[in-house]
């Protein structure tokens, strides 16, 4: 069944001229994410009228689904913008405010109600790479000395202002995290039962200053709807929800993907040309000098090209295959290094495995190169069969050696970066590819010079 696009329906309703009450009722059937998608197709005046129809609670939900809330918040007077932000979950509010200039952000934060301002300021105090910056303060909290009846009463009292009610978090008399209760267990419990029996004391948690990259896999492994976030004193300061986890995983993947290209994860469509150039140029300068080194090595084999010009036809193939293999090994290694419990023996096993994979792939490609390139050189370059297969054999052996070494380089470099506490994703694709180009050039032209020219006197 084809996925339905509701945007056109929503726009048609908005432009239909229905009375406000009827329009609000019909729009309430649509998810806030679909309503958010429709905002860009409206004029500023139409958006203002829509906000008035929907009410601040719904508008706050819609804003939480926007990828970039800045242009929409700036359309609102600061007082109205603050009202919308105060009705958003704290983590969504911080995401929306992060898109604003510091002056606009401070103006809105200054007009938030006391509780919202405290939550937002707390989340803004964390670094972008810390769990605390992505948590929400929207959760149910009860004390461990309550009865079942009191806990149910507290749940009903807090549920009106909190969406995350599937798990109740329990604190002791000192406000320290004590455990968690599943909502289902509380609902089916008898009034005379002890609340203590329902509390999961060994409930998993994360700490507010933990790096997102260090604990994201652990959060995913628990597969809970939410996890508590504790400070250094063991106090409950927020929770990480499953929706937050999806965003964090997506951000981490985007971050690693950018680093594999030698970029930064912050670059986007709204960033200026100068800022993008400033972020990319250092990598490109470093790679320029490495490229010059590769070129100088190629220049050292001018005599080989002069005697046997055909070898230059297959240079790019050997270099590309070496680079591809190195990048594959890099991607596998970065994924494995996420496991903080990875032992030295497992790292050596990975290194040995990647080299064997490179060897097997290289051998298979070498056989193909021997046959196909041999025929190509004979029929299209007019070499006799013997010389044609000697040349294709040299290419094949070069592929084997270059691919094994490239597998080694693509595995060992991120391991070294990880050892010295540098993000292994920084050992990016361009760097690995350039190093492997250097290795492949030396192997290919070295074999051609030693075997084909010095030993067999071809050319």
Positions of predicted regions on the chain:
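Short leucine-rich amphipathic alpha-helices used at interfaces
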Residues: 6, 12, 17-18, 24-25, ...
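Electropositive phosphate-/nucleotide-binding environments in soluble metabolic enzymes
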Residues: 32, 145, 149, 209, ...
């Amino acid at each position: 069944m084809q996925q339905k696009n509701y945007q056109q329906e929503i726009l048609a309703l908005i432009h239909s001229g229905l009375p406000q009450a009827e329009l609000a009722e019909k729009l309430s059937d649509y998810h806030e994410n679909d309503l958010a998608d429709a905002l860009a197709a409206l004029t500023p005046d139409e958006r203002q009228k829509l906000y008035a129809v929907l009410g601040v609670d719904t508008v706050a939900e819609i804003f939480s689904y926007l990828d970039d809330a800045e242009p929409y918040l700036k359309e609102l007077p600061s007082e109205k913008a603050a009202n919308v932000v105060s009705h958003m979950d704290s983590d969504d509010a911080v995401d929306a405010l992060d898109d604003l200039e510091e002056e606009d952000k401070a103006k809105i934060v200054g007009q938030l109600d006391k509780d919202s301002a405290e939550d937002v300021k707390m989340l803004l105090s964390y670094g972008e790479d810390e769990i605390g910056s992505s948590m929400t303060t929207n959760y149910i909290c009860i004390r461990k000395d309550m009865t079942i009846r009191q806990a149910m009463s507290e749940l009903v009292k807090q549920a009106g202002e909190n969406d995350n009610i599937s798990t109740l978090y329990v604190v002791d008399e000192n406000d320290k995290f004590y455990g968690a209760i599943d909502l289902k267990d509380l609902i089916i419990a008898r009034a005379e039962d002890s609340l203590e029996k329902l509390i999961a004391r060994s409930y998993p948690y994360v700490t507010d200053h933990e790096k997102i990259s260090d604990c994201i896999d652990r959060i995913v492994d628990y597969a809970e709807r939410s996890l508590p976030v504790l400070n250094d004193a063991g106090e409950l300061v927020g929770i990480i929800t499953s929706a937050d986890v999806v965003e964090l995983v997506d951000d981490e993947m985007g971050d690693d993907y950018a680093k594999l290209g030698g970029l930064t994860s912050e670059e986007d469509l709204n960033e200026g040309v100068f800022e993008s150039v400033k972020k990319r140029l250092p990598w490109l300068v470093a790679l320029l000098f490495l490229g010059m080194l590769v070129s100088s090595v190629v220049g050292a084999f001018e005599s080989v090209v002069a005697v046997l010009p055909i070898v230059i036809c297959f240079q790019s193939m050997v270099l590309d295959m070496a680079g591809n293999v190195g990048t594959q090994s890099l991607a596998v290694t970065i994924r494995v290094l996420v496991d903080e419990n990875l032992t030295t023996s497992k790292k050596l096993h990975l290194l040995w495995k990647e080299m064997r994979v490179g060897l097997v792939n290289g051998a298979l490609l070498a056989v193909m190169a021997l046959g196909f390139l041999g025929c190509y050189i004979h029929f299209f370059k007019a070499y006799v069969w013997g010389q044609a297969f000697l040349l294709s054999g040299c290419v094949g052996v070069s592929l084997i050696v270059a691919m094994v070494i490239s597998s080694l380089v693509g595995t060992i470099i991120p391991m070294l970066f990880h050892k010295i506490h540098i993000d292994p994703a920084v050992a990016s694709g361009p760097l690995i590819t350039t190093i492997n180009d250097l290795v492949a050039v030396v192997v290919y032209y070295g074999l051609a010079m030693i075997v084909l020219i010095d030993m067999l006197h071809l050319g």
